[in-house]
From Swiss-Prot:
Any one GO MF annotation of this record: metal ion binding
Species the sequence originates in: Petrotoga mobilis (strain DSM 10674 / SJ95)
PANTHER family named in the record: TRNA MODIFICATION GTPASE GTPBP3 (PTHR42714), TRNA MODIFICATION GTPASE GTPBP3, MITOCHONDRIAL (PTHR42714:SF2)
GO cellular component entries: cytosol
Keywords associated with the record: Cytoplasm, GTP-binding, Hydrolase, Magnesium, Metal-binding, Nucleotide-binding, Potassium, tRNA processing
Protein's UniProt name: tRNA modification GTPase MnmE
Pfam families: MMR_HSR1, MnmE_helical, TrmE_N
PROSITE patterns: G_TRME
Amino acid sequence: MLNDTIVAISSPIGTGAIGVVRISGDHVKNIIDQALKRKKYTPKKMYYGWLYDKEGEKVDEITWVYHSQPHSYTGEDMLEIFCHGGKLITYAVLNTIIKYGARQALPGEFTKRAVLNGKMDLIKAEAVNNVITSETEISLKASFNQLKNAVSEKIKDIKNSLLNISAQIEVEMDYPDDIEFEDHDLKNKLVHIVNSMNQLLKEAENGIIAVEGVRTVIVGKPNSGKSTLLNALLRKDRAIVTDIPGTTRDTIEENLNINGIYIRLIDTAGIRYTEDTLERVGIERTINSIKNSHLILFVLDGTTPFTQEDELIYNKLNELGDKTVIIILNKSDSPNFTENNYLSLKQKNPNDFVIISAKNGAIKNLENKIYEKFFEKVNIEEPTLTNQRQKITLESSKEFVLNAINSLEKGFSNDIIMYDVRKALEKIYELSGENYTEELLDKIFSTFCVGK
């Protein structure tokens, strides 16, 4: 559908000084001619005038800029109209343009066209969305590093290396009697590619955390103060707080900013043995949330001894191994609070143990501990991958390169080695967007705002 013309409001909806309406496609010049009554104009120059409807009535007093293809964001003819801010007048401009033959753009469709027209690759397109949706300066920094094409250039280098190897093998296959390359030379080139991939993958998880947030799960036995802690961290009442164990039967998700670190916080059902069907479903969701988390906040009730339920959770968390766990002794405000029941646990985990009062909001030491655990991970200086799609696709490409090295070492024929090199290339093309499916693009751009 790239031959049609699209339009969308690109500014936030609501009262403001200026509204922005963006148009892209083959019909842009006709719209300028008919709706703006302008015959001569220069690209990249701002003009003042009126927008007219099809009956010749003035819709709004505007300024506008024309961008000629291919020197525009989408690579197509584009028109950007700057009208008076406000919901009614901005929608009036939008509807006027639609009556001149444009259609309402889909989410992310302008950027999707930019990718399809070769103005940017898929990695940069995802970075555009990340920059817009960044919640913290750290996530903005990681996203902006991608926006500057640094990651794309590294992927391009990997692609070119694979293309050169593919060409080298193909020449040898076409002229086996005349040309024969040394196996160790080919292996060294493949190993160099794997090393380049490893360099990107090494910081990938931290890049994902920086942009998408630290997936943080609050766990503990029922009535240990998990929901109170959630509310304290958010500085608002989000979860129901009662003295009845098992009140939280579903996961509650919220986002917050702790000293510049983006936290995706999940309050979960308390873990215990129960016959209650709904509560058991909640506990299953808790376990799934734990498996997918980066950080686990294990809440203990400081007014009670360390129970079998606490021990069950503690042992389960230890089995995970690679998770960051902070043990939180809660309810320090209570006259029944005592640290004595948990001294052994504190001695085993001296750097991961904090005492708080969630009820009174005395949680600064917990926030400092979270910052201490994750600041170095997310404060990334080097450009890196920033989502699971990018990471998984590059890992898949790397597996094919490793297969090619293995085939080479075992003395397999060139056509077998070539198969893996080509499959590795296919994954690199998928990563950059040179090889795509509509399903992939729809999934990526559906998360964009309309007008971008």
